[in-house]
Design a protein with these regions (language model features):
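Terminal RNA-binding accessory module
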Residues: 1-75, 79, 360, 368
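Rossmann-like S-adenosyl-L-methionine
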Residues: 2-11, 22, 222, 226-456
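Short, acidic/hydrophobic/Gly-rich beta-strand patch recurrent on exposed beta strands
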Residues: 26-31, 149-152, 216-218, 347
């Protein structure tokens, strides 16, 4: 039976919000029809104006909060409403954790039709100032005023700010110093539409445990006017600075970094650690942006893997090998599989750096490489997967099921694709036992989750 749409664009309606969507927006029902409302919270009664109507849902602009949630708080950031970096600053941290747990539970129930325990979210001791890496875009507005900050929601319009409240302070210091230098010497910001202008992005990277700081200036050309002044100012105003790097991106694209990098001052990488592992992090290398929460996530993966030192582990979508190496010290042998060649090179260097002789890294498609390992006599006891937001390819899941490990540990950054993939595994001889969400990105709508599956 065709659903009757009870609203039209421009309608003013009142509804009760009963949950949060995947982007942090409030979700409610009006005469049984789903309405999304940015800025609204669960258990709130709100008055909205309908701005968009589709076949199965509508979008409303929040006009008035008739009855506020007990968990509503005043956002701490002065540009929160304009900036797209955070979605949940108007919700208490306790409320954020409960909503994220519910988001995982709802996806598993609604999409995967699964009945498994979702544990309380592992929250952060410090939900602010956690990002060890920040990329600040630079732009000039129509009146010629320099803007450096973050993009507005779903746009490439730069919201100007002096500091990001979820970033480590050193990253903010880098951004402020480069801004002062650009203003003082009238250095141009890049224009995405025309392809003109020099400075595209300003990036900072912080070694949380080492204290090392790297400043990266991403430019559209090779020459940097008054470069020596920039370096001296960064050395003076950024505590812990050990590296200044230039990345050159000449392509007229919205991809942040180019392929060419040169060191302007100091080292080509900074050091940091996760648990007992140490890492060299270059300007372009992948590293978890929340070091403190990453350790909690990896420890949970280690707990679910239940290693005694005798097991063979395969880590699919292993990236730069952080999870592989985290498990290697507790396993007999670990194989990491990753299709991105530069990531595998980084993984091999990380294994060498940490003297993990029992970690081997393979560049290739997991659906092809898993059967090869099996044909070569490798029988994994545990398989770990840490796929991108789209989840695992079905051929990879089928290959894992065919290999028949005793346990599968699934690390997910998207509850919807997690639910879909767990449902597939349940149809292929595995049972999802427990899901542990981890809050890697406080103040945002993102949630990570570690799930244990065993052979049924």
């Amino acid at each position: 039976m065709k659903q009757i749409i009870p609203v039209k664009q421009g309608d003013n309606i009142t509804l009760t919000v009963n949950g949060l969507g995947s982007s942090g927006e409030g979700v409610g029902k009006y005469e049984g029809f789903t309405v999304f409302v940015k800025g609204a919270l669960p258990e709130e009664e709100v008055r909205v104006t309908i701005t968009l109507v589709k076949k199965s849902y509508a979008v409303g602009a929040l006009e008035e909060i008739v009855k506020a949630s007990a968990e509503r708080v005043e956002p701490a950031c002065p540009v929160y409403k304009e900036c797209g970096g955070c979605q949940l600053q108007h919700l208490s941290y306790k409320g954020q954790l409960e909503c994220k747990r519910q988001q995982v539970q709802d996806a598993l129930t609604r999409i995967g039709h699964l009945n498994l325990e979702v544990l309380p979210v592992l929250g952060a001791a410090e939900p602010w100032s956690y990002r060890n890496k920040m990329q600040f875009p630079a732009a000039t507005d129509t009146e010629g005023v320099l803007h450096i900050g973050c993009y507005a929601t779903a746009t490439h319009s730069v919201v100007d700010t002096d500091a990001c409240m979820i970033s480590k302070e050193a990253n903010n210091a880098i951004m402020k110093t480069v801004r002062t230098w650009m203003q003082h010497y009238n250095i141009s910001a890049y224009d995405e539409k025309t392809g003109k202008g020099l400075v595209r992005h300003i990036m900072g990277r912080v070694g949380v445990h080492s204290g090392d700081v790297m400043a990266v200036i991403i430019t559209s050309g090779y020459d940097i006017p008054h470069r020596s002044v920039l370096i001296e100012w960064l050395k003076r105003y950024v505590l812990g600075l050990v590296s200044v790097v230039q990345n050159i991106n000449k392509k007229q694209t919205n991809v942040v970094m180019g392929s060419k990098t040169r060191v302007l001052y100091g080292a080509e990488s900074i050091k940091d650690s996760l648990g007992s592992l140490s890492f060299h992090i270059s300007a372009q290398a992948f590293f978890q942006v929340n070091s403190e929460q990453a350790e909690k996530l990896y420890n949970k993966a280690l707990e679910f893997a239940a290693l005694s030192g005798k097991e063979t582990v395969v880590d699919v979508y292993c990236g730069t090998g952080t999870i592989s190496l985290y498990l290697a010290r507790h396993a007999k042998q670990v194989y990491g599989i990753e299709i991105v060649a530069p990531a595998i090179e980084n993984a091999k260097k990380n294994a060498e750096e940490n003297k993990c002789a029992n970690a081997e890294f393979i560049c290739g498609d997991a659906a092809v490489e898993l059967p090869k390992l099996l044909a070569g006599g490798v029988r994994p006891d545990v398989v770990v997967v840490d796929p991108p937001r789209t989840g695992c390819e079905q051929k990879v899941l089928a290959a894992i099921a065919k290999v028949q490990p005793e346990r599968v540990v699934y690390v997910s950054c998207n509850p919807a694709s997690l639910a879909r993939d767990l449902a597939f595994m349940e149809q292929h001889g595995y049972k999802a036992i427990v899901a542990q969400p981890v809050d890697m990105f406080p103040m945002t709508s993102h949630v990570e989750c570690v799930t244990l599956l065993t052979r049924s």
